[in-house]
């Protein structure tokens, strides 16, 4: 089973009292599988990993692995600010049954490129899971440069990168490193279609929490080089790309999920979607139903 196509960075549903809503979690997982996603990320930034206890982390990963039952790839977010803690969290995810570790660059500490190289090598050597690098400078404060990635691609336990930067030059530099054992995944919904048309292997998406089938359709078209159809779907989904960044992730996408009956909000310091954006959430949640139906029909006809 390849690591490619549409991979959803799952939001974590909470109940009205703020505890994990495992019934909603299982329903979200089934909706994702029914929509055709090819992988899931558990307890990443979209999953509010920083707000989860160790026991909650274990519960989410274990439940996802059991629910998925080998049907798609399970990636667990394991990146923390220190190398030793990241290794320990990666080992924890391995014990829980995850197939891959999604390892973000260490937040806040801003290591040098040499430090990033040593960090990822240590995690790959000692974590017990295949590592997918994750670069998202807007959140972490450091940028994993292509030349550093180039020094990591030969490591047998480093199998890909999720790149949230969208510049064509960055994407091209990473796509040039692709191989049978190293994949390039977009981490930006808004530019993902163009990245895949340029050779990227897939998308780790936020908005696919609410529209799994539509984003599967987008990825299928872009990955097979169907420019006109891919661009048409990218246009249909452009409002969702934008909306999911209108406030800090995962605030907007959790507003969409709540309207679909999944979850009841966020944990501090994140607050619910502001009143000014609620009408847009209402409209987009309603429109998502039609887009999911259209994408399903197209995939059945393809």
Curated annotation (Swiss-Prot):
Active-site residues (renumbered): 134 (proton donor/acceptor), 162 (schiff-base intermediate with substrate)
Presence of the UniProt keyword Cytoplasm in the record: yes
Site note Part of a proton relay during catalysis applies to: 45, 108
Q: Which UniProt keywords apply?
A: Amino-acid biosynthesis, Cytoplasm, Diaminopimelate biosynthesis, Lyase, Lysine biosynthesis, Schiff base
Instruction: List GO BP terms, alphabetically.
Output: diaminopimelate biosynthetic process; lysine biosynthetic process via diaminopimelate
TM spans, by residue? Answer: none
The subunit field of the Swiss-Prot or TrEMBL record says: Homotetramer; dimer of dimers.
Family assignment from sequence similarity: Belongs to the DapA family.
What protein am I looking at? 4-hydroxy-tetrahydrodipicolinate synthase
Query: Gene that codes for this?
Result: dapA
């Amino acid at each position: 089973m390849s690591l490619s196509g549409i991979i959803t960075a799952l939001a974590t549903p909470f109940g009205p009292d703020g505890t994990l809503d495992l019934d909603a979690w299982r329903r979200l997982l089934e909706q994702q599988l029914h929509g055709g996603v090819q992988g899931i990320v558990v307890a990443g930034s979209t999953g509010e990993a920083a707000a989860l206890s160790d026991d909650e982390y274990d519960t989410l990963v274990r439940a996802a692995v059991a629910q998925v039952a080998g049907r798609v790839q399970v990636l667990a977010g394991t990146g923390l600010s220190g190398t030793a803690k990241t290794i320990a969290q990666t080992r924890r995810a391995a014990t829980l049954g995850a197939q891959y570790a999604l390892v973000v660059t260490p937040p806040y500490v801003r290591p040098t490129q040499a430090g990033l190289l040593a960090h990822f090598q240590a995690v790959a050597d000692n974590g017990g899971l295949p590592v997918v690098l994750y670069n998202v400078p807007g959140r972490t404060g450091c940028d994993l440069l292509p030349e550093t990635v180039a020094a990591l691609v030969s490591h047998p336990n480093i199998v890909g990168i999720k790149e949230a930067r969208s510049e064509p030059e960055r994407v091209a530099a990473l796509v040039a490193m692709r191989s049978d054992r190293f994949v390039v995944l977009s981490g930006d919904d808004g530019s993902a279609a163009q990245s895949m048309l340029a050779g990227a292997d897939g998308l780790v998406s936020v908005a696919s929490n609410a529209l799994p089938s539509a984003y599967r359709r987008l990825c299928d078209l872009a990955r097979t080089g169907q420019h006109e159809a891919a661009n048409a779907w990218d246009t249909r989904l452009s409002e969702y790309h934008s909306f999911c960044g209108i406030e800090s992730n995962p605030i907007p996408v959790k507003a969409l999920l709540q309207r679909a009956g999944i979850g009841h909000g966020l944990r501090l310091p994140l607050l619910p979607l502001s009143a000014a954006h609620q009408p847009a959430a209402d409209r987009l949640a309603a429109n998502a139903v039609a887009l999911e139906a259209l994408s399903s029909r197209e995939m059945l006809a393809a």
